[in-house]
Amino acid sequence: MLFRSQEYERSWDNLTKPYPGIPEMLEACLAHGLKLAVFSNKPHPFTQACVERFFPAVPFSHVVGQGDRFPKKPDPSGAIWIASQITSQSHRIAYVGDTNTDMKTATGANLFAIGVAWGFRDIPEIREAGAQEICHTADQLKNLLVSRRA
C-alpha cells in the first residue's frame, strides 16, 4: 500500500484533468461576481496542490482540505465556517458536489445543494441525499449559479 501511495503522490496529475467546461464555468461565475471556494475530504496539502495545478488563475476565497481544523464531511462544520466567511446569508450559498456526502454536508450546513451528474455517484443517490437541483453539464451549472445570484 505504501508503494501505491508513493506512486500516486508522484504521478497523480498525469491523467487527471478538470471535467469538460469547468474552467470556463469558473471564469463565467467570477465574471458575474460570484465568490468561489473549495472544500474537500482529501488531505489539505493535496487539495491545495490540485487547485494550484488545475486552476492557478482562479481566485478561490478559501481552499480547505481535510486536516485537524474540521471533521470530515458530511460533518457540516467546515462548510458552515467557509460560508460564514463569505456572507452572513448562508442560504444564498450554493454547495456543488458529486457525492451523497457532499449533499449531506450542504443540507447540514443549510446551503443550497446542487448535485452534478458527471461525478462519482449516480443521480438517484445524490438526489436522495438532499440535492435540490441536479446539473448535467458545466454550462447548466453556470446558468443555475448565475441565476441564483440575482
Regions found by a protein language model. Give the residues of each.
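Short, acidic loop-to-helix structural element flanking the phosphoryl-transfer center
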Residues: 10-38, 44-49, 76
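Short acidic-hydrophobic, aromatic-tinged amphipathic segments that line or gate anion-handling sites
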Residues: 133-137
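Short amphipathic alpha-helix with an adjacent loop that forms part of the alpha/beta core around
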Residues: 142-150
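Substrate-recognition "cap/lid" segment bordering the active-site pocket of phosphatases
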Residues: 14-17, 43-96, 100-109, 123-127
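Nucleotide-sugar donor-binding loop of glycosyltransferases
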Residues: 117
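Short, small-residue-biased leader/transition segments that mark boundaries at the very start
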Residues: 1-2
